[in-house]
Amino acid sequence: MTQTLSHLENRDAFIERHIGPGVDQQQEMLRTVGADSLDALISQIVPADIQLATPPDVGDAATEFAALAELKAIAGRNKRFKNYIGMGYTAVHTPPVILRNMLENPGWYTAYTPYQPEVSQGRLEALLNFQQVTLDLTGLDIASASLLDEATAAAEAMAMAKRVSKLKNANRFFVAADVHPQTLDVVRTRAETFGFEVIVDDAPKALDHQDLFGVLLQQVGTTGEVHDYRELISELKSRKVIVSVAADFMALVLLTAPGKQGADIVFGSAQRFGVPMGYGGPHAAFFAASDEFKRSMPGRIIGVSKDAAGRTALRMAMQTREQHIRREKANSNICTSQVLLANIASLYAVFHGPAGLKRIASRIHRFADILAAGLQHKGLKLRHATWFDTLCVEVADKATVLARAEASEINLRSDIPGAVGITLDETTTRADVQALLRVVTGEDATFDIDALDKEVAHDSRSIPAAMLRDDAILTHPVFNRYHSETEMMRYMHSLERKDLALNQAMIPLGSCTMKLNAAAEMIPITWPEFAELHPFCPADQAEGYLQMISQLSDWLVKLTGYDALCMQPNSGAQGEYAGLLAIRHYHESRNEGHRDICLIPSSAHGTNPASAQMAGMQVVVVACDKQGNIDLADLRAKAETAGDKLSCIMVTYPSTHGVYEETIREVCDIVHQYGGQVYLDGANMNAQVGITSPGYIGADVSHLNLHKTFCIPHGGGGPGMGPIGVKAHLAPFVPGHSVVQIEGMLTSQGAVSAAPFGSASILPISWMYIRMMGSQGLKKASQTAILNANYIASRLKDAYPVLYTGRDGRVAHECILDIRPLKEATGISELDIAKRLIDYGFHAPTMSFPVAGTLMVEPTESESKVELDRFIDAMLAIRGEIDRVAQGEWPQDDNPLVNAPHVQRELAQEWEHAYSRELAAFPAGFENKYWPTVKRLDDVYGDRNLFCSCVPMSEYQ
């Protein structure tokens, strides 16, 4: 038969590449689960009243090459001016060895958050290095493994200051007037929900105010002035005020550490350590504090512990602080950090070392001195007598200066009254300084850079002597060893080999959607057209970005059934927070600000109650029935009791228990009946796209995890993106921005992130995914994800009971395996199974969430039947091993499960176990064996002996 041209063009090629099971495999799986077709299976699972007749129209699929060409043309509309705007964002040189071997390497970017430390030692070591950089530069005792951005870190510092303050009746927070405006914006948003009064004034005036629990200072002010705050900090601390200082990683290479001056908390952005501006992100924030406050720290902390053999091993420490455990009592709602970006920054420090960093920082400062001298020789006045990299130049005719700058394709900071700001960076050259001198002075002349250099080299007073660092930094061998590209390449590869990522095996984590992050989706994020833009550049320079964001927003609006979308939240938890703020402000606009009760099902993810608490709401828990569904009678009773105080409900769909609840529309109706709003958590959107939608179901607002459903990689624990979709009545209440006005979004609300579009530079990933899949491909992806989950459930249900099912015994896109009966009978726990899976070459499913003693499995649509069968066979083999324990063949305290995982070293030692070496290490055969480098971690030891900085190199041998 003659094939049509359309068939030969194969525009659907990417759909077949993204979806793991081919047509034949799908048919085999459908036979196993007892369904005639994908459509028939979906009709058995998804309630008929919420099924869409046709998938939302986001266009037809495009090939990888057509989509890349289309996006390249859009990116070409961006204008790549030289940016000297500053305000916490600068141009960088990402070392090519890091770009190629890490940022563009799926062994790094497809890994998950290191909750399973035995398969995460590589990136845990890189994160520990990041913490060491933070400790050395800030002069404090304990550091986190990154936060979402600098402004969010400031808000977290304020919240932490209140938590640890001994002045329990104090409710005022002072912010120095020269912090970055976007930082102040996010602090004010957070303070409003906490009921804090924010005072903004010149830093010394903090002493004039009473009832302060905290003060926020910035070491290098937003217009460039270098501050020596040691006396002010000393006086504030004598009054028991918690002092936070915003700082800059590169400046700290030369400047004295704020911790040495008495600061309690120091934070800032690590962006200029090798991470491009990317129109606002993603970037890692650093955060450090005094040891006495360690258990009140937000975010993740990497600690040094021991494994079962007593060898040094790394893990995430003090996890009981996190929202997964403490829910509404958590220190923060932070779930995603910025691991990939923190690791770029940490490796940047490793590659350059202390001498290289000092050379870069000194060069930046020297160019600033040269520029200052050249301007002063021409009669121009500098507003400040001190600076590191930023000059505030007073100009009589600012409009003319800015016009000359624009004509020269240069961006200066323009929002300072009577002055322009110029921030230099590591990319600055002599030619750049020449161009800046011409633009600002208006003289078309050649300036003698060498003469200016000689003038300033021996008489620089722009950094006061008291502010110059006098201690050594980064003395640990890891920062002094890998400076050739060969050594650096091998070091990064040695770290990568320790970890298990999607490039080696499926990661079946429930509620995490570890799907394919296709190479074609990743390519655009390193294009300079996207990477080099400053988030506060003029809009006409970002037309490509704005077009791409507008198209992506339109597609997501259609796919969610909402009316508007806000891209600003840079994690799912921040999306929850932003959505709840929209609900709060909506009620306030109707003179119903008293509505503050948030109903949350008992099965909810821990971020839900933590976010509700952050948004100033009271959490009331709604019971679930024996089938895992929301108990409608309890919901009605709780809604009626709340009455006119009901603000909203937070509900996940399909439920966190892995089923499509038949009564979801009734849930929405009950809440609406009592005047509440419905927040539908988008964590499980991968089971909705093209089949149903939150808006069609009846919800008012949702966040979308672009790092789950829409293919942004997890990066080993970040970046994430959590944009919110809203119905029209909530659109005026989504986050705004004080620096950049967001076109088309009628909102006067405060910001929740530093940049107006959050982590804009990773949005091309989701744009590419939707463009290459098209309407039908997206629907088929959801259908296949559901098929894969039901295939696993069908094959494993006799060995491990499936805890919750819907109609006809079906599950949604994930299933919960109940390990409790096995544990009761044999003593083998879900933890033992999780660790034994490592020996079989798999990352464990989600443990003990949402039900203790269970494993939650989510295969996604990207895994083929071959890989699913490999996982199923491993689980069945493990069940056989459990049976051997039950039958007494192996002791309960000496079997391959309780001793798992097994490492190479122990195979070479004397073997005294009741099972063979081969069964221990090669239960699935000898091909493509993954070797963990440590045995099971001792969590108790790690938390009781908290150590969160680099260990001697000998410990890694």
Swiss-Prot record:
Phosphoprotein as UniProt keyword: no
Residue ranges that the Swiss-Prot or TrEMBL entry lists as coiled coil: none
UniProtKB keywords: Oxidoreductase, Pyridoxal phosphate
Catalyzed chemical reaction(s): N(6)-[(R)-lipoyl]-L-lysyl-[glycine-cleavage complex H protein] + glycine + H(+) = N(6)-[(R)-S(8)-aminomethyldihydrolipoyl]-L-lysyl-[glycine-cleavage complex H protein] + CO2
Superkingdom field: Bacteria
MF-aspect GO terms: glycine binding; glycine dehydrogenase (decarboxylating) activity; pyridoxal phosphate binding
One Gene Ontology cellular component annotation held by this UniProt entry: cytosol
Class in the EC hierarchy, top level: oxidoreductase
Function as written in the Swiss-Prot or TrEMBL entry: The glycine cleavage system catalyzes the degradation of glycine. The P protein binds the alpha-amino group of glycine through its pyridoxal phosphate cofactor; CO(2) is released and the remaining methylamine moiety is then transferred to the lipoamide cofactor of the H protein.
Known partners and oligomeric status: The glycine cleavage system is composed of four proteins: P, T, L and H.
NCBIfam families reported in the protein's UniProt record: gcvP, PRK04366.1
Protein name: Glycine dehydrogenase (decarboxylating)
Organism in which the protein naturally occurs: Cronobacter sakazakii (strain ATCC BAA-894) (Enterobacter sakazakii)
Gene name of the record: gcvP
